[in-house]
Amino acid sequence: MMRLVRRLGLSIAVTIAAVGGVVGLGLRVRPKPFPAYAVPAPPLDTVEIPAGLPEAAERFARASMGEQAPVIHSAVVSGRGWIRLGGVKFPARWRFVYQAGEGYRHYIEATLFGQPVMKVNEYYLDGHGRMELPFGVVEGEEKVDLAANLGLWAETVWMPAVWLTDPRVRWEAVDESTARLVVPFGAVTRDTPEAFTVEFDPDTGLLERMVTLRYRDTEGERKGWINEVQAWMEAGGMLIPSRVTVTWEDQGEPWFSLEVEEAVYNVDVDKYIRAKGI
């Protein structure tokens, strides 16, 4: 009997190891990129960099855009990377659709062997957030709305001209390489401003990281939320981040890494931003 139990235990251990090995191989396979967003982008109008910016913000504006800032109304940004779910780092591909300063749709696929094993549609439209997750839908929560609004303004790093051209946005000086970015609320009424502390590279003037307090779920309090830029690329007459990591401060390591492969500006997204999937 004991010999049978030992053999059974060995068999189970071998099976678990084999399954774990197969899954490990699947996690190494990068998914194919999404098809290019096949809508021609129009030429972008430009305006002068506004006067009166804090030193760090003005240096960033000129380092990333030159003397003129493009006027951005919408964007479709696509790429790949990875997302950490339950402690496991899954390859991912994603497409984010924006109405500048107003709303977004996130479509994310976590993959195994290059095939989707989880699909997520997240929306921030008309000032309200909605998350369509495999285990249910989250909406109608003020904390979700506030978190989504901060997400919108953090992701505006892919269209940084909006931080200069939207009259609701305000920059405040901190020091030579740091500034405070104050952003509007969306549909939620609050007395305390929503703001990011934005740190810039003292040598290049380019943005290094954005830090704020953000809700992670509908139950807890705000937690430190960090967006860090790892690399840059040219798109739409601007330098935009080509690689970004997102970290909850109390977790100590990124849970999402995004590598941009395409950014298209001022295309019609009125229907696409309310759609599902790719």
Predicted regions and their residues:
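Membrane-interface motif at the C-terminal end of an N-terminal transmembrane signal
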Residues: A18-A36
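N-terminal leader/targeting segments and the immediate start of mature chains
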Residues: R30-V76
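Gly/Pro-enriched, hydrophobic low-complexity segments
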Residues: L181-K271
